[in-house]
UniProtKB/Swiss-Prot annotation:
This is Fimbrial assembly protein, serogroup I. It comes from Dichelobacter nodosus. Keywords: Fimbrium biogenesis. InterPro entries: TfpX/TfpZ-like. The lineage of its organism: Bacteria, Pseudomonadati, Pseudomonadota, Gammaproteobacteria, Cardiobacteriales.
Amino acid sequence: MNKQRFLFAAKISGIHFLLSLTVAALLAGLIFFVWYPFPYQKIMGSFKLFFLIFGIDVCCGPLLTFILSNPQKRLKECIIDFSLIIFIQLSAFIYGMYNIYLARPVAVVFELDRIRVLSKGDILLDELPQALPEFRQFPYFGHHLLAVRDWKNAEERKEGVEKAFQGFDIAQQPTLWVAYSSELEKIRKAAKPLAQSFLKLNAKQQQDVKTALQKAHLNLEEAFFLPLVSNRSMEWMVILDKNMNITTAVEIDAFEL
């Protein structure tokens, strides 16, 4: 590669890289602030998925541009080359966004002694038509805040346990979903006072809790906690206020407290 071609290719691929980076940054805002707000981007593993898909895409597009760019090519050849590169890169972006969209949290469910975060793929979708009408559709942005109701009878309990053995815990069974606000007393009984477990934490964990409480404008004496889990993580703790509202979360294994 001669110097003239190298400089030309470097300039064009540099512009392409900046444009790709700008698009990726805009999409990152949608992903991490709308589909995966804190702490779900860590609990659901979206950071790894985003950087795997878009990191490769942002690098490969400009690299192809660098390889194919040549000032000696005719305009028609350049148009064909760049159209092909844009098509490949755009297809990868769309594929990546589609998979990230499917893996986003669509339901946050109180289940016995924990809060479980679910993506669409975690849920027994065959039951969705039998769920309460307001929960049959997943929101495009945000998620449903739910709880699991009690069994109606022994037969329903038996069926639910059988589904759990098939890989779908009770939080993943839409027929058992009710509004989170309808089960506040049950949640209150399961939640543990954070102040009573605070001294069991190590120094770093205590500082993380203090920082989280400060950001949530919550006093330690008024805070409660439950384990926050997903199919990808079991090492988080959700912090609740005295009204059992979810306020924030900390990366601490609450099952050990």
